[in-house]
């Protein structure tokens, strides 16, 4: 059975993840909207690594949202590349299984191919001591990882640049983003794997918005516009660790983790 976890915002992600019965956890190493370098919780990477290993808890780190290595704007692309490198090294130091980064976008009027070339350069120049997992996005003109066609072009560019049969570059499938981008979740896993050959992580999120909306607003599994059975089907088909990035209020995040684990264990249908 794949591991099921949650994105945790509190100061002690390990304790919170254990309390909700998760066996994987995702968190930020610093401000997700800022350009400052990563911060190791407690300041000692070896202590963090040992604690999570002792608890048999897999770690995934989400890179800051500001990173956009695809852009032609030097004032964003260059610091993005630097911050991505810092995040990769920091994530590796605490024993993370992967670093998730959004595909980014090119500005209006800029050729999509320029974004692909910027991604190639980033992958070629950045040391990757752990897998860098590119995540699909919900909307935006010039998005590098919104449509399946765009994902295909981006994957070809980065896997070729990686030069290691793609082992240091992977893919994270976000269900809310896919639904908002107009990708049918009923066969999304098969269609993505036909492009990438792999799905390394699933962000199992429902959506507050309708199919094809282009909006990125997560909802708890039982309360969004996506049939929970479709979300469960994605997790089962992908066979990868699933992380819930859903609202925490009123115990919703913990309930999502619990429901997913129960459904995967007992293979029953949705029960409201």
Sequence positions of predicted segments:
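Non-cysteine beta-strand/loop elements that form the S-adenosyl-L-methionine
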Residues: 23-28, 57-61, 170, 174, ...
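Short, electropositive alpha-helical surface patch
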Residues: 75-88, 111-124, 148-157, 189-193, ...
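N-terminal pre-domain/capping segments
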Residues: 1-63, 67-86, 270-272
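Active-site acidic/histidine proton-transfer and metal-coordination neighborhood
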Residues: 53-54, 69-171, 180
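Conserved, mostly hydrophobic/aromatic
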Residues: 17, 62, 80, 91, ...
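Active-site beta-loop-alpha junctions enriched in small/polar residues
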Residues: 7-11, 30-32, 64-68, 104-106, ...
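Gly/Pro-rich active-site loop or hairpin
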Residues: 110, 144-148, 152, 177-241, ...
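Acidic (Asp/Glu)-rich catalytic clusters
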Residues: 15-22, 40-60, 85-95, 123-129, ...
């Amino acid at each position: 059975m794949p591991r099921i976890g949650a994105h945790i915002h509190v100061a002690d992600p390990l304790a919170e993840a254990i309390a909700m019965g998760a066996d994987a956890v995702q968190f930020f190493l610093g401000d997700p909207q800022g350009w400052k370098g990563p911060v190791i919780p407690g300041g000692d990477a070896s202590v963090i690594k040992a604690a999570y290993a002792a608890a048999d808890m897999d770690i995934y780190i989400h890179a800051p949202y500001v990173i956009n290595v695809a852009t032609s704007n030097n004032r964003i692309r260059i610091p993005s590349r630097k911050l991505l490198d810092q995040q990769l090294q920091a994530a590796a130091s605490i024993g993370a299984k992967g670093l998730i980064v959004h595909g980014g976008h090119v500005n209006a009027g800029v050729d999509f191919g320029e974004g692909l070339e910027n991604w190639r350069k980033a992958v070629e120049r950045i040391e990757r001591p752990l897998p860098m997992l590119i995540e699909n996005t919900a909307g935006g003109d010039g998005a590098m990882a919104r449509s399946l066609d765009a994902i295909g072009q981006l994957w070809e560019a980065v896997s070729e640049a990686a030069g290691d049969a793609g082992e240091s570059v992977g893919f994270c499938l976000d269900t809310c983003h896919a639904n908002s981008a107009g990708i049918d979740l009923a066969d999304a896993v098969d269609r993505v794997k036909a492009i990438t050959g792999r799905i390394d992580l699933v962000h199992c999120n429902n959506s507050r918005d309708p199919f094809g909306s282009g909006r990125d607003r997560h909802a708890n599994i039982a309360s969004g516009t996506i049939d929970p059975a479709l979300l469960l089907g994605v997790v089962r088909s992908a066979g990868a660790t699933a992380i819930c990035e859903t609202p925490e209020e009123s115990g919703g995040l913990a309930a999502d983790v619990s429901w997913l684990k129960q459904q995967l264990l007992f293979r029953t249908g949705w029960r409201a």
